[in-house]
């Protein structure tokens, strides 16, 4: 039976179901058991991290499976990688994806390489949950969107859900996966609500989803920007333009077939990605389509991304920094040779 719950609650529920199903699943990270650096809280008062996503887990599973750590991403990420390589299935919470630089070796040079280095005999079934994205008024060091960086690393899988239903099913699939999976959660979407079944279900990694069908243009959007694209598609529909909104859901593995199937209908592609443009997912998808699907195109590929600057702290500048429905509508009208917005 489906209920309407938030993205945060859907992610929380996925972790609970996974931990109930498999005693080898554990949670490790800063403040995942307690409140944000508040040592005196009792377990029955624990907030569940700075954003409350792990609330209630320590009460049900105890502190042997829900582990608070010191402020050392290198330390607990190394411990989690080691635990995964010896048979456990840790969920490691990296509070902000901006902090990944402190544990590059553990993730990129160790965990991502084990299966390959040991001829496929080693498994590292770790899920790294982390937050990304601007719009939270958190300034340059807590607002980056770094999923493209991890997508470029062989041996890592990357998942970026856009809604509560997908978040639950994709997280359960990630936890079941025998390779390291980075699961990116948009901070500003935690309160987004949608219908989510109560039971245990998975969504296969590497399977895209068409969030809205259309014949005039394909809007390939990543994570939170799927919802921005849907808003733009609704506005375009009022002008008689039907945009297809394609949500990749996972970036590695990537559902290339879904992209080309959509382009066979629309023959036009706009990529919406809130990360910086250089060496980004937007750039990669554009190159992929240019290499393998050029004959499907009736117009140039367009990209709508953040500028190549750090995320500004000023709310006015931050709002301009991100893709918006109006930006998407304007680029679409230009691509189709339609009159511009007034």
From Swiss-Prot:
InterPro entries: THDP-binding, Transketo_C/PFOR_II, Transketolase-like_Pyr-bd, Transketolase_C. GO terms for biological process: acetoin catabolic process. Keywords: Acetoin catabolism, Oxidoreductase. It is an enzyme of class 1 (oxidoreductase). The keyword Protease does not apply. CDD domains: TPP_PYR_E1-PDHc-beta_like (cd07036). SMART domains: Transket_pyr (SM00861). The keyword Oxidoreductase applies. It comes from the Bacteria. GO terms for molecular function: oxidoreductase activity. Gene3D superfamilies: 3.40.50.920, 3.40.50.970. Pfam families: Transket_pyr (PF02779), Transketolase_C (PF02780). Pathway: Ketone degradation; acetoin degradation. Its EC number is 1.1.1.-. Tetramer of 2 alpha and 2 beta subunits. Catalyzes the 2,6-dichlorophenolindophenol-dependent cleavage of acetoin into acetate and acetaldehyde. This is Acetoin:2,6-dichlorophenolindophenol oxidoreductase subunit beta. It comes from Bacillus subtilis (strain 168).
